[in-house]
A protein has these predicted regions:
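Conserved HGGG/HGGXW glycine-rich cap/lid loop of the alpha/beta-hydrolase fold
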Residues: 14, 18-73
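Conserved acidic catalytic loop of the alpha/beta-hydrolase fold
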Residues: 83-100
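Short beta-strand immediately N-terminal to the catalytic nucleophile in serine-hydrolase-like folds
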Residues: 102-104, 128
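Gly/Ala-rich beta-loop-alpha elbow adjacent to hydrolase catalytic centers
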Residues: 104, 108, 112
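Flexible "cap/lid" loop of the alpha/beta hydrolase fold
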Residues: 113-117, 121-154
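Conserved alpha/beta-hydrolase catalytic His-Asp/Glu region
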Residues: 135-142, 153-208
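Conserved loop-alpha-helix segment in the C-terminal half of the alpha/beta-hydrolase fold
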Residues: 213-246
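Catalytic histidine-centered segment of alpha/beta-hydrolase-like enzymes
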Residues: 246-259
Length: 272
C-alpha cells in the first residue's frame, strides 16, 4: 500500500505477562500517543495503511491483540475481554504512553470500551463499528465457522481467489495483506473472542465510561438503528457519526470517509 513515510518500526514489549507486538507510526514528534486496536481476525499489519495516515498527526501504536499477528498465542492463554483490555492498559504503562488516546475497531472497540472503564489515563475513546451483541440482545451476525474456515484456508496457503469470498468488497491490495497475515490468528483466541461477543455485557461498560467517546458507525454495516438508539439511551454523551458508504471494515472500503468521521474529536484533525 502507498506509504506516507510515517512507519517507524515494529517491536515487542513484555506487558501483562505476555509478549505484545505493535507497529509504531509517526513517533513522538508527530503528536500525542494513540493506541489502535484492530478486530477479531485483523493482525496489526492489516491496519498498517491506517497507521500510516494516523502517524501524520499522532504517535500511533497499532496492536497485535494476543493470539493474532506476532503477539503471544497458543491454546493455554486467556483470551477473555477482561484480559485483552488489561493488555492494552499494560502496554501503555510499559511504553510510558500515559495519557493516551484509544481507538478500537469491531472486537477491538469492545476491548477499548472495557479498557477505558479501568484506565483513566485514556483521555478519549473512539469506537469503530463495535458489535453491540451480548446478553439479551440479538446475536453477533457472523458465525464462528466463517472465521475458522478462512483461517484454515490461509494456513494452508490459499490463493487470493479462495479468500476473496470472505471480503468481496476489498481491493486486491488489502486482500493480499490479509492473506499474508490471517494464518497467524490462533483458533482458540478467535473461538473465545467470538463466544465473548455473545456473553460480555459491553453495554454496562459503555454506560460506565467517563471519557469522551466517539462511536463511528458503518452506514452499510451490521449495526441496526435499534442498536444505535440503545447506545444513545444508555450513554447519551456519546457522539455518533456514520460513514454512509462503508461496510463493517470501514477503512478498507472508504478510508477518506473514515478519516473525516474523526473530524477534530481527538484534539487535532487527522491529516488527510
Amino acid at each position: 500500500m502507498k506509504s506516507t513515510g510515517t512507519f517507524r518500526y515494529g517491536a515487542h514489549v513484555l506487558a501483562n505477562g505476555i509478549r505484545q507486538h505493535y507497529l509504531r507510526y509517526g513517533g513522538a514528534e508527530a503528536g500525542p500517543p494513540l493506541i489502535l486496536v484492530p478486530g477479531i481476525t485483523s493482525p496489526a499489519a492489516t491496519w498498517g495503511f491506517v497507521g500510516e495516515r494516523f502517524g501524520r498527526t499522532f504517535d500511533t501504536y497499532v496492536l497485535d491483540v494476543r493470539g493474532r499477528g506476532l503477539s503471544a498465542s497458543g491454546p493455554d492463554l486467556d483470551y477473555s475481554l477482561d484480559t485483552c483490555a488489561k493488555d492494552v492498559v499494560a502496554l501503555a504503562q510499559a511504553l510510558r504512553l500515559q495519557p493516551y488516546l484509544l481507538v478500537g475497531h469491531s472486537l477491538g472497540g469492545r476491548i477499548a470500551i472495557r479498557a477505558a472503564r479501568i484506565d483513566r489515563q485514556i483521555e478519549k475513546l473512539v469506537i469503530v463499528d463495535a458489535p453491540l451483541s451480548g446478553p439479551g440482545r440479538p446475536p453477533y451476525p457472523s458465525p464462528l465457522d466463517r472465521y475458522l474456515t478462512a483461517i484454515r484456508l490461509a494456513r494452508r496457503g490459499a490463493s487470493l481467489e479462495e479468500l476473496r469470498p470472505f471480503t468481496p468488497t476489498w481491493t486486491e491490495e488489502h486482500l493480499r495483506v490479509r492473506a499474508e497475515w490471517l494464518h497467524t490468528c490462533d483458533e482458540t483466541a478467535i473461538t473465545q473472542s467470538h463466544h465473548g461477543l455473545q456473553t460480555d455485557d459491553i453495554h454496562a461498560d459503555l454506560a460506565a465510561v467517563q471519557q469522551k467517546v466517539l462511536f463511528i458507525v458503518a452506514g452499510k454495516g451490521p449495526l441496526s438503528a435499534e442498536a444505535i438508539d440503545e447506545v444513545r439511551r444508555i450513554a447519551p454523551a456519546v457522539l455518533i457519526r456514520v460513514v454512509p458508504n462503508a461496510g463493517h471494515m470501514i477503512p478498507m472500503e472508504d478510508i477518506e470517509g473514515f478519516m473525516a468521521a474523526f473530524d477534530d474529536f481527538l484534539g487535532k484533525r487527522l491529516d488527510g
